[in-house]
């Protein structure tokens, strides 16, 4: 007598072959970009170790510093009064290189095999991250060394974002893209959390390991990427996704056989069959200025400039702010700052889900940006009154600040990179993603720089700067929000309501 089919086998059979491959790509690209962000985070945790008040530390017998020197345990050249400017310069060496490199990276991403491009980028990123940490073991105290390493790391890290968004866009169509990418985009926060926790283990001892360990993990992930990444569904005989929501858009003529779900599936399989029999003609890669002409690219790019300014200022300066204002240790401040990223995960998922249901990407971003401004104001004034208020405010601020940032860099970029105005004639995903994220990275460079310059005048002024940037990000979306409201009015006047996603 045979037993019934094992429950685990039923689970495997419940999903199609295409679904398993899509799940693999989603998981792999999630881990890839989590590693990229993990390798960026240690600098924000180690800052409070590079410059610290040493009055309560026990000075070694052979130390040559004067008895009145309260900075003897800090790491030169960050042991002087201008340490904030120097640390801001190190941050900006990475961010400016990243912003410049991003515009170039998208062009290469459209023209080079993504698997090779990503693998090489991760290996080099792991190398440069480790070299920063080796400065501790090699006893390097020259500012130029840390700046050069940050510039090189910023350039090679630009290989990541356009490539992973392009890869996910190749596998997933527009339906539920916001929700799927909202969950997937939590890799940013997961990477930040891992980077904070790993760096926190060694920050009070051998802080060089705070960089070396994430660097090694990133390099290993680069090898895994080379072995397993699949760029296109057609490469493994899977059906390509449908962009622009064709089935819903063609419901006006349901009797047309070409508009049925079956015919769409068959046409996709026909494409796969043709590609498997012989080489398919590759569509031409879009030019930089051609990508700028896609409706919405300029507005969302400029919005992201200010949204990312706010997000990256928190990324690089939040642990130091918590340590200075709430008087936590470097490790405690780093651990507490991870709650901002926890909020970012929630905010990204909520933003994707709401924008899918309403079909209003710009409106979703605008509403969250409007709510973020008063929340940042409240966090600055009451966020450090107690541990409970700090936890709650960090999660709320993280969700409202990172939600729009996550939505623009994922679902919006993928939507615009496969925009119907392209008519399927151009490969634009990587270039559009690079333009949007590259413009945002200019803000990411400006934010920490301005924070470093403004913070000596008081943390209140830093928060006023962040609130101003948040309001500007919101205003830049006004035209697109107006268009979405008009579209909803037309939809409601026809009695159709919102489309079901």
Swiss-Prot record:
It is found in: Endoplasmic reticulum membrane. It comes from the Eukaryota. InterPro entries: MFS, MFS_dom, MFS_trans_sf, SLC37A1_2, Sugar_P_transporter. Detected in intestine and pancreas. Lower expression is also detected in liver and kidney. GO terms for biological process: glucose-6-phosphate transport; phosphate ion transmembrane transport. Keywords: Antiport, Endoplasmic reticulum, Glycoprotein, Membrane, Sugar transport, Transmembrane, Transmembrane helix, Transport. It is a multi-pass membrane protein. Inhibited by vanadate but not by chlorogenic acid. It catalyses: D-glucose 6-phosphate(in) + phosphate(out) = D-glucose 6-phosphate(out) + phosphate(in). GO terms for cellular component: endoplasmic reticulum membrane; extracellular exosome. Glycans are attached at residues 53, 62, 68. SUPFAM superfamilies: MFS general substrate transporter. Pfam families: MFS_1. One of its GO terms (molecular function) is glucose 6-phosphate:phosphate antiporter activity. Residues 240-262 are annotated as: Disordered. The chain crosses the membrane at residues 19-39, 88-108, 118-138, 145-165, 189-209, 210-230, 302-322, 334-354, 362-382, 391-411, 434-454, 462-482. Inorganic phosphate and glucose-6-phosphate antiporter. May transport cytoplasmic glucose-6-phosphate into the lumen of the endoplasmic reticulum and translocate inorganic phosphate into the opposite direction. Independent of a lumenal glucose-6-phosphatase. May not play a role in homeostatic regulation of blood glucose levels. Belongs to the major facilitator superfamily. Organophosphate:Pi antiporter (OPA) (TC 2.A.1.4) family. This is Glucose-6-phosphate exchanger SLC37A2. It comes from Homo sapiens.
